[in-house]
C-alpha cells in the first residue's frame, strides 16, 4: 500500500527501465515531486528490446502500465533524450537522486561454471547480447552462444538469431538448455522451441579459446575437446551494473550539500542485476524507503519478547 508522504521531497530518477519507472510511479503517488530522466527517446530500458524477442511480446506491458500511471500524476515530469552527468545532476539540485541505469551483458566467459576468462580470445569475434539487440548483424553468419546464465535469455536470443537467418550453436555447461527454467516450468518449452528451430545444442561443455574463426570447447566431465566453426561468439554469462554516474556522484560527495543533494542511491540492475520482476521490486522498495529505511528484522522477525522502546 502506498501511503501519502508527510514530507514532500524533490527526487530525480535517472533511467526509465523497470526499476526507474516503478520508483517514479510510487514516488509520484506518494506525493513527491519527481523528475524522470532517460537518455534515449523511448522509455522502458531493457523491456523495450527484450519484448521484441520470440515469445516475450507481453513483457512490454510492464512498461506500458507504468507509463500510463505516471502520465496521470501531475507531479511527475518525464525528460526523454536527457543524458545525465554528475555535473548536470548536481546543477539540478534535487534532494534525492535515484540511479537506475541498468546493467550490460559482459563480454567474457566468467559465469556460474567459470571464475576465469577465455584463455585466448579474438575480441573481434566476441559480441554481447546487448549489441546484437541494438545493432543486428544483417549478413548471414555463424553464431555460437555460450550460455552460462541458464535462464531464458540464451534460448530466446538463439531463436531470434535463427529467425534472422543465421546459423546458431547454443553451448551450455549445464546438462540442458535453460536449466533454471526447471523451477519456473519454462525448461521444456524452451528446449522444444530451440530444437524445432534447428539450433545445434551442445551441453556439458565449457568454452576456452575463441580464435581464427572457431571456438574451442571441452567437456566438463571427461575433458574431451571439441572445435566449433563460428563467426561470432556471444557470451551470456553475467551482467555488469552500469554505475558510472553513481560512482562519479559518490566521488563528489563534498559538493552535494552546496547543491541541495541529500542522498544518492542506486536501484534495480544498477545495484544487483537480476530478472525484470526483481528490478520492479527494487524500484518499489526504494520509493517507500525514501524517508525511512526499511528493516526486515525489525518488522518481520519473530521475537520471544517485545522490543524495548
Stretch-by-stretch model annotation:
Residues 45-95, 181-208:
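N-terminal Rossmann-like dinucleotide/flavin-binding domain of flavoprotein oxidoreductases
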Residues 213-218:
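Short polybasic amphipathic segments
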Residues 3-39, 43, 78-93, 101-182, ...:
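Rossmann-like dinucleotide/flavin-binding elements
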Residues 209-210, 266:
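Generic beta-strand structural signal
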Residues 207-208, 220-222:
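Short polar/acidic secondary-structure junctions
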Amino acid at each position: 500500500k502506498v501511503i501519502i508522504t508527510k514530507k514532500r521531497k524533490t527526487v530525480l530518477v535517472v533511467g526509465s527501465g523497470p526499476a526507474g519507472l516503478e520508483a517514479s510511479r510510487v514516488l509520484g503517488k506518494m506525493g513527491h515531486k519527481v523528475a524522470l530522466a532517460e537518455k534515449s527517446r523511448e522509455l522502458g530500458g531493457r523491456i523495450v528490446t527484450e519484448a521484441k524477442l520470440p515469445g516475450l511480446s507481453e513483457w512490454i506491458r510492464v512498461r506500458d502500465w507504468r507509463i500510463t500511471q505516471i502520465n496521470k500524476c501531475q507531479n511527475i515530469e518525464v525528460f526523454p533524450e536527457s543524458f545525465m552527468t554528475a555535473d548536470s545532476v548536481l546543477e539540478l539540485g534535487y534532494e534525492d537522486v535515484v540511479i537506475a541505469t541498468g546493467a550490460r551483458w559482459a563480454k567474457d566467459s566468467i559465469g556460474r561454471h567459470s571464475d576465469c576468462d577465455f584463455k585466448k580470445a579474438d575480441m573481434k569475434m566476441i559480441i554481447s547480447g546487448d549489441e546484437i539487440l541494438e545493432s543486428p548483424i544483417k549478413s548471414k553468419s555463424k553464431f555460437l552462444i555460450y550460455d552460462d546464465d541458464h535462464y531464458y535469455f540464451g534460448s530466446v536470443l538463439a531463436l531470434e538469431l535463427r529467425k534472422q537467418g543465421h546459423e546458431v550453436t547454443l553451448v551450455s555447461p549445464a546438462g540442458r538448455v535453460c536449466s533454471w527454467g526447471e523451477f519456473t516450468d519454462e525448461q521444456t518449452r524452451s528446449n522444444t522451441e530451440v530444437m524445432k528451430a534447428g539450433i545445434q545444442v551442445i551441453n556439458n561443455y565449457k568454452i576456452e579459446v575463441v580464435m581464427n574463426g572457431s571456438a574451442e570447447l571441452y567437456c566438463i566431465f571427461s575433458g574431451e575437446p571439441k572445435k566449433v566453426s563460428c563467426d561470432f561468439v556471444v557470451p551470456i554469462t553475467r551482467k555488469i551494473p552500469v554505475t558510472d554516474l553513481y560512482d562519479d556522484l559518490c566521488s563528489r560527495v563534498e559538493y552535494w550539500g552546496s547543491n541541495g543533494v541529500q542522498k544518492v542511491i542506486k536501484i534495480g540492475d544498477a545495484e544487483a542485476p537480476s530478472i525484470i520482476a526483481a528490478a520492479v521490486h527494487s524500484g518499489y522498495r526504494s520509493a517507500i524507503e525514501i524517508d525511512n529505511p526499511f528493516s526486515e528484522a525489525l518488522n518481520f522477525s519473530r521475537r520471544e519478547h517485545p522490543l524495548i522502546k
